[in-house]
């Protein structure tokens, strides 16, 4: 155990090494600051169809994505590039039917639901515009359509402002 006098001397020494004088605090030349460049998220429309239902309250509950009216078996495309994280029927998402999810970086992910089939597998890189599956009506749906979600750190957000 350290005696109080030794501990006090040690603390005084440490504190004396941490003192910054005004002359040391002001640089004598230009300061270089490096900032990471982060591209804003921009999405392409994921299917050849029209918006049939938007994000927000619907039928007394929250609709967490966009519904796109599309003919059965037409291609559903990646709205931007990323890595497939899931494809198929997912536990906890039974109402969504056949699903594809894509991690697009920066905490953002995409979810495509009600597909009749998927064309991708987990771990696969997809380019923007590449087919991820075919439109269908799997899970809980009343007709063929694509349900499309944008998620930020797992939380659904309105994708509409991100379409370029």
How would you describe each model-predicted region?
Residues 74-76, 84-85, 126, 132:
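Generic structural signal for buried aliphatic residues
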Residues 96-104, 116, 124-164:
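Conserved, short, structured surface segments that act as functional micro-motifs
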Residues 48-78:
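Short glycine/threonine/proline-enriched tight-turn/helix- or strand-capping micro-motif at secondary-structure
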Residues 44, 69, 75-79, 112-113, ...:
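Small beta-strand-rich domains/subdomains or short beta-sheet motifs embedded
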Residues 48, 73, 81, 117, ...:
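ATP/adenylate-binding site constellation spanning eukaryotic-like Ser/Thr protein kinases
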Residues 2-55, 83, 121, 127-130, ...:
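Intrinsically disordered, low-complexity
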Residues 53, 70, 86, 114-117, ...:
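A residue-level detector for short acidic-glycine micro-motifs
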Residues 63-64, 79-119, 144-146:
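Zn2+-dependent peptidoglycan hydrolase active-site motif and core
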């Amino acid at each position: 155990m350290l005696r109080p006098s030794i501990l006090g001397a040690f603390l005084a020494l440490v504190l004396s090494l941490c003192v910054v004088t005004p002359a040391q605090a002001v640089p004598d030349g230009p300061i270089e600051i490096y900032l990471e460049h982060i591209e804003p998220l921009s999405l392409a429309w994921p299917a050849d169809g029209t918006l049939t239902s938007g994000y927000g309250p619907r039928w007394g509950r929250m609709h967490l994505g966009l519904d796109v009216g599309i003919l059965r078996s037409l291609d559903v495309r990646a709205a931007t590039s990323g890595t497939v994280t899931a494809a198929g029927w997912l536990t906890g998402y039974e109402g969504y039917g056949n699903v594809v999810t894509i991690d697009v970086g920066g905490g953002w992910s995409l979810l495509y639901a009600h597909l009749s089939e998927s064309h991708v597998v987990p771990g696969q890189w997809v380019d923007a515009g590449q087919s991820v599956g075919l439109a269908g009506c799997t899970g809980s749906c009343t007709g063929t359509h694509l349900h499309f979600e944008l998620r930020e750190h797992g939380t659904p957000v309105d994708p509409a402002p991100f379409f370029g």
